């Protein structure tokens, strides 16, 4: 059965529109609906020398496979002009409107998944909206109390206990209650969305050497280890850890792990991006819909040049398609 996926172009001054337009160069097995300003897409296509027919989205028609040379567009009006590579805070609210339209469409079952292009957090905040990222935005919009940020590439999935918070706040944020909820969401989605019957989750410690028996920090002794043991006993989830972050990515562990759970953003993401930058995908777990995204930023210096690497965007779309098809 043909599905309908919605794609957001992200920050209009960045490479998001370039990545979206690149999708028009080939056939796709499902319908792709792009949430963006149609005029902006037409201008960027001309700048890039891409010959594409932009079709108006009609929700009343049945989805059909995406044909090369076309893009279906759900027009969201952009209030100010856009020049590739030049941020304009007057368009900050426009970016949020594209995200809102896509998410609400998924929540109404109009769309089967969201694939998001890169946004610029700074320009949205300068537009007067407190915005820390897609993950938190979609969680608030869908009234989801807690979501889990996962990134994946070939041979590695990593998830986070904390996401976009200052490093100084991480220790207090890693609580038994949060660990219980994060691991529950991670395990459930590995089973339900990734079709892994009995997931094996490897868990990082917080401190260097996972605390070195309390000599380098007591969070492992007081919080992480007892919480993992409680989950093992009560839920039977296969957990290994806490392990030192500088050894958990050893091949002997990764060959067995279905996911690695890190305590904070820069503990695990540098490893994943080194392993698969440009070929990795951001997946939000715990939402009432499927959402994937690129693993990189807006790359303003590449916008409109034709030099943007489409690898991560294609990977995000392919992962979304795989997850949608597993639901069938």
From Swiss-Prot:
Question: How is the cofactor bound here?
Answer: Binds 1 divalent metal cation per subunit. Can use ions such as Zn(2+), Mg(2+) or Co(2+).
Q: Name one GO cellular component term.
A: cytoplasm
What does the record list as GO biological process?
pyridoxal phosphate biosynthetic process; pyridoxine biosynthetic process
SUPFAM superfamilies assigned: Isocitrate/Isopropylmalate dehydrogenase-like
What Enzyme Commission number does this protein have? 1.1.1.262
> From the UniProt record, which GO molecular function terms apply?
4-hydroxythreonine-4-phosphate dehydrogenase activity; cobalt ion binding; magnesium ion binding; NAD binding; zinc ion binding
State how it assembles: Homodimer.
Instruction: Please tell me what else the database record remarks about this protein.
Output: The active site is located at the dimer interface.
- Protein name (database record): 4-hydroxythreonine-4-phosphate dehydrogenase
The organism named in the record is: Vibrio vulnificus (strain CMCP6)
């Amino acid at each position: 059965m043909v599905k309908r996926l919605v794609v957001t172009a992200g920050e209009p001054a960045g490479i998001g529109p370039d990545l979206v337009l690149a999708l028009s160069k080939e056939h796709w097995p499902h319908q792709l609906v792009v949430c963006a300003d149609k005029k902006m897409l037409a201008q960027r296509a001309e700048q890039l020398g891409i010959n594409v027919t932009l079709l108006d989205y009609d929700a009343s028609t049945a989805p059909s496979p995406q044909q090369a040379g076309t893009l279906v567009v759900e027009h969201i009006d952009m209030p100010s002009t856009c020049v590739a590579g030049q941020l304009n805070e007057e368009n900050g609210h426009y970016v949020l409107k594209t995200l809102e339209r896509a998410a609400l469409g998924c929540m109404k079952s109009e769309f089967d998944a969201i694939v998001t292009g890169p946004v610029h957090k700074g320009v949205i905040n300068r537009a007067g909206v407190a915005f820390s990222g897609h993950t938190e935005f979609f969680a608030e919009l869908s009234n989801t109390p807690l979501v889990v940020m996962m990134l994946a590439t070939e041979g590695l999935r990593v998830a986070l206990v904390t996401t976009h918070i200052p490093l100084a706040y991480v220790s207090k944020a890693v609580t038994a209650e949060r660990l219980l909820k994060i691991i529950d969401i991670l395990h459930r989605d590995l089973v339900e969305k990734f079709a892994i019957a009995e997931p094996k989750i490897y868990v990082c410690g917080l401190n260097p050497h996972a605390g070195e028996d309390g000599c380098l920090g007591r969070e492992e002794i007081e919080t992480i280890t007892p919480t993992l043991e409680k989950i093992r006993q009560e839920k039977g989830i296969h957990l290994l850890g806490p392990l030192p972050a500088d050894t958990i990515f050893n091949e002997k562990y990764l060959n067995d792990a279905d996911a690695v759970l890190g305590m904070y953003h820069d503990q695990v993401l540098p490893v994943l991006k080194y392993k698969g930058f440009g070929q990795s995908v951001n997946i939000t777990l715990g939402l009432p819909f499927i959402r994937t995204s690129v693993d990189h930023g807006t790359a303003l210096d590449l916008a409109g040049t034709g030099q943007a690497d489409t690898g991560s965007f294609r990977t995000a779309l392919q992962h979304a398609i795989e997850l949608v098809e597993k639901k069938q």
